[in-house]
Amino acid sequence: MLMTSLLLAASISGTQLVSAGNDDDYTRTIETWREQRLERLKAPGGWLSLVGLEWLKPGTRTIGSASDNDIVIAKAPAHLGSIEWKGDKVTISLNEGTGATIDGTTRTRAELLDDAHEQPTVVAFGNVSFYLIDRAGGKKGLRIKDSEATTRTGFLGIDAYPVDPSWRIEAKWVAFDPPHTLEIPNVIGTLDRMPVPGKAIFERDGKAFELLPVLESDDADELFFIIADKTSGKETYGAARFIYSAMPRDGKVVIDFNKAYNPPCAFTAFATCPLAPPENRLGVAVTAGEKKYRGSSH
């Protein structure tokens, strides 16, 4: 019986992958990763520049900074133009003389490709730009960015737990054949049905835990974990933290909780982030990765 118990524990326990001699190298690797993450976040078109989200309705709506527009954007020309949503297409028509561009050109009319495309159509004027987003339930909206947004210019940086090699875990991987489907809630009140190729099982503090990663696309080459834990809403952002992992190999998957990072919603009220599903709310304090943003008001 004792041997059986030991074998069972060994089959699910998470393995620490960093030896004591390699701690310094590993710490530098994580610190470099964090620096790169910070630079992406702070980029002029990064998540810190998000200043608005305008949901569209079928039909034609005017857009500009003047109060008589259907959609008012503070830094836009007074009467920028109009947006028409008809069937599956959304089209932008710019008024003459606005100085606005469509994908960097002086065109005045174009179909707006949404963010499901690798390069959505971008309408820009001054420091401000917007593009179309498409969400579950047939919702379409304009995501508005301003490189001079106070969320970007007044950014306070990101606090994080000290790098802890014990939180880089090799978990057992159990593949699902066929893949399962998981309903992922989001902050705008809809559900995204996403494929789950399997589950990761690991042990921490003598207890076994499971996590369900999702695939973000049919050709995804990484697993996407949306997690919460006992630090959520206290030391870390309450809605979720994100982790990407390489695809499983030989029945194992590496989950590096030191790379757990805040979703865009931790920094702005205008993002459409997924929330951690009940299946991924861990009953353990994950004292690794990013902490709650000090500058957040939500």
Where are these regions (language model features)?
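An exposed acidic His-Trp-rich patch
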Residues: 103-116, 208-259
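C-terminal boundary/linker segments immediately following FHA domains
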Residues: 17-19, 95-96, 101-171, 179, ...
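Bacterial N-terminal signal peptides
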Residues: 3-14
